[in-house]
Each structure stands twice: as C-alpha cells, then as structure tokens.
Amino acid sequence: MKQQIRQEKVTASFTEAKAIGFHFRGAHYHLSIIRDVVTNDILGKPPKLAADKLRWHLAGFYWELVATFDCTLQVVAAAYELRLARNKVRWDANFRESLSTMKVANPLIDRIGEVISSDWYQDALARRNAITHWDPAFVQALVADGRVVSVRMLNQEDLVPACERLLSNMREFFEYAEATLPAGRIQFL
C-alpha cells in the first residue's frame, strides 16, 4: 500500500511536470498571436477592429503564464512528498511549513519566494486577475488620425516586448526548478 501511494505521488509530479510544459507552450502560443494581432491587425487600423482578439489572447497568455508557476509548485509538493492536497498547493504558510517539516534544503525554495515577491510575477498575476473582469490587462492604444500607432502597457512599455520579458522570466524560473529538484525526478519540457 505504501509503495502504491509513493508511486501515485511520483506520477503526480510527472503529470504536473508535463502540465508545466503544456502551460508554457500555451503562453508562447498566445504571445505569437498577440504579436501577430498587434503587428498585422491593429497597427495602422481603426481602434477596436481587433480588440476582442487581442483581449482573448492576452487573457490566455496571462492565465497560462501564471499556471506555469502554479504547476511548478505542484511538482515541488510531489517531489518532496509534502502530503498536501493538490487543490491546497499554493505558496502559503502550510506549504512553507511542510517544506520545513520535511527538512527540504533546496535553493529552489528561496527562489520560489523570490519569484512570488518579484515585480514581474506580481505584474503577471495582477494582469491575469484584472483581465478576467474586462480590464484590458492595462493595455492602451495610441491613436493618431483615427489609426492605432502603438500598443503599450500603461507603464509605456511596448506590449509585445513586455510579454516576451515575462515569458523569458518564467522560462528561467522553471529551468532553475528543473535543475534543482531531485535528480531524475522531473523534466519539464
């Protein structure tokens, strides 16, 4: 019985590891559509022509990006057998206490805390939450002569490079996670 439970936990970690790649590829896909919409469907055209398409893919991008991180926490919980219900795995006091109880000494744990408190992750999380309620993910179009000339974040950063930066940060994080988890247990992509 104990061996079966252990096998289920290992399987869960591999399942979640596959999900990380799935969500990351999903974010990458949505970014490719965002790039195409901004470049080909919005710039130089009347505003709102492709606004819905952009919003759908922005929502998908942010949901998949945050899901990549959430699945990484699932993998950590499974890899270290933290005995947390899968629907209760989140970076909170219970998770950190379980890591402490299991005497997990891995630099990944500190890195998870750094990511959670980082500006880029908080930005992605805020955008993911905001776009659900029709805040267009803090995006604005600069219009001149009735045509869109640029699509930017409200902080004036161009939309596509901003999304590319977030995706790059997430890739760096989960590659670090893959390298620091117990050898042979996890392969994300």
Feature roles, as predicted:
Residues 68:
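Short, positively charged
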Residues 1-39, 45-63, 71-189:
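Acidic, Ser/Thr/Gly/Pro-rich intrinsically disordered interaction regions
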